Amino acid sequence: TPPDLHLTDLAPQVWGSGATCGDLAVMAETAGRWLAPVPFVEHAVAAAMLAGRAEWADASPVTLSLRPADAGGIWSLVPGGAVAEVVIGVDAGELVAVRSTPPGSAPRNHASAPIAHRSARDGDRVVLGAAAEFERALAEWKVLTAATLVGISAMALELAVQYVQERHQFGVPIGSFQAVQHGLADLPGSIDGARLLVHEAAAVLDSRASGRCDTAHNDIDDPIALASMAFLFAADVAAHVTDRSLHFHGGYGFAEEYDIQLYYRRARGWALILGEPATELLALADRFWPTTKAGAA
């Protein structure tokens, strides 16, 4: 069960002592399945970046900013930023870690995500390296977030199947109607596909391979590209599955008494933390076909 996994007790040294991205993907899927109200993904990725630094050993939780700081030194909408003691991110071309007091509150209407704006310059600040070193951490975040979205999708499907077996119309369960069956039949395949892509991306990240993007032969083992692919596909699947599940719940799907509304909101909110999906799609296209981009410039 989720409490038995002790997800929030992961120390900065855990990743370096044996936990792989694939291991963490399994735990992240469980966190998504139960909508764990903790910034597990952000903490796991950021803690790995701080491994071996004794001065940060007592910091918990830690997180990372997905976007570089603006001209005023502000990291916007940091996932886990409302509760994190340390934030890692890019500021003025450098990868930095900043320790400061978290605000303890988050903006409303953000799917209950503990996000917040944080300063990249106020607090105890340490330079960890060049901005380019953040690329791998961001890829790890995408893969683990994709895993949480797979967990959301899997539970949303279970809720739908359970409901259509319990809800009766015309004296029979609505799950016996062919239209309902057809609406749910294709979802397991989509969820399994997203899970497979997540674990493929995690395996490539764990291999530390530089990778390649041979789209002509469908031979892609570039960790950065696979991370984006896993994230985008899992986000799309989660939105589709939760939409279908909520639809078959009928009017009850919008009621707070039914859990599907929680999964519906978080499937969209968690996927948008990175930003507009179209931007990520364009970045992935540039990764696949960099010469096309250069030729158009």
Model-derived features with residue positions:
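Alpha-helical interface subdomain recognition
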Residues: 1-34, 136-297
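FAD-binding core of flavoproteins
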Residues: 35-158, 162, 294-297
